[in-house]
């Protein structure tokens, strides 16, 4: 009887192990993992496509991406409510200090390159602006296109909301930290600005190149540092990557500490397989040297 009992127990154990193995096989062999990510609206479409493609290759790992602006994503990372923040600007020192005080060491990854596009209505005859002229438009110095060699038509400036990384980058780079004109129309996202410019002959706005390149009904202006300097388009990939285009910038992902496990796989994938997708969405892939530097942060 004792031998029969032992045999019966052994059979039960074998069937149990087999059942567990079968369940693991059916489920992909790994426990489902969810990565939460939030931040830049400029990067929202890019990050959503990255998340979808990554999940296609790593079925057990899901990445939930939402927008709200770079500042919103960074705040969420500091509070520990997301695993990753996408940002179209670098973290400010005050934000880094807040993170460290909260016990979080933010790690920065450059993941793509953007050239902020200055867009106007297709009927606007202006083709080129200098950085000073652009600053004058957004600080309220210029209020009519005729002052810039254009038509006698009021200028309507469109920009982003204050939580946007692009809002802050533009204020630092173009306005030299001056205030925006109080007449600027603050819009919720890049698509809203594109739509506004399509319907406003006097309008001017700034959007990520990933949005401008795919839009119709708008014109993308060339920019120059000053009047004697050459002007460049954000559609000129070499000019953006080399920094000749004056509004070139990196796009970032931030993690709380050096990523491990599934999060490390996600960052590794973005810096390798994800780079061609950045080009497909309309942004620019990182140069090889920059990729090597970012990959070293995962070692």
Language-model-detected regions and their locations in the chain:
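Exported/periplasmic ABC-transporter solute-binding proteins
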Residues: 5-9, 16-18, 23-299
């Amino acid at each position: 009887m004792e031998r029969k009992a032992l045999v019966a127990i052994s059979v039960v154990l074998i069937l149990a192990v087999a059942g567990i193995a079968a369940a693991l096989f059916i489920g992909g062999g790994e426990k489902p993992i969810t990565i939460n990510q939030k931040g830049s609206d400029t990067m929202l479409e890019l990050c959503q496509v990255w998340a979808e493609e990554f999940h296609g290759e790593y079925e057990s790992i899901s990445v939930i991406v939402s927008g709200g602006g770079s500042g919103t994503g960074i705040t969420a990372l500091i509070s520990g409510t997301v695993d990753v923040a996408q940002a179209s600007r670098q973290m400010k020192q005050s934000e880094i200090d807040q993170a460290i005080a909260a016990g979080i060491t933010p790690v920065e990854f450059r993941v793509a390159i953007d050239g902020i596009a200055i867009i106007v209505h297709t009927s606007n005859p202006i083709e080129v602006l200098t950085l000073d002229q652009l600053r004058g438009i957004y600080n309220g110095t210029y209020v009519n296109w005729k002052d810039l060699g254009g038509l006698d038509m009021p200028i309507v400036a469109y920009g982003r909301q204050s939580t946007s990384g692009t809002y802050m980058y533009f204020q630092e780079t173009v306005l030299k930290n001056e205030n925006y004109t109080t007449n600027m129309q603050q819009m919720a996202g890049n698509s809203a600005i594109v739509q506004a410019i399509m319907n406003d002959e006097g309008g001017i706005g700034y959007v990520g190149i990933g949005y401008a390149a795919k839009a119709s009904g708008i014109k993308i202006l060339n920019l120059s540092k000053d009047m004697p300097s050459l002007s460049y388009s954000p559609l000129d990939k070499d000019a953006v990557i080399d920094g000749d285009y004056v509004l070139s910038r990196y796009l970032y992902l931030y993690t709380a500490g050096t990523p491990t496990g599934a999060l490390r796989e996600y960052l590794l994938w973005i810096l390798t397989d994800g780079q061609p997708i950045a080009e497909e969405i309309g942004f620019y892939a990182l140069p090889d040297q920059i990729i090597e530097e970012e990959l070293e942060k995962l070692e």
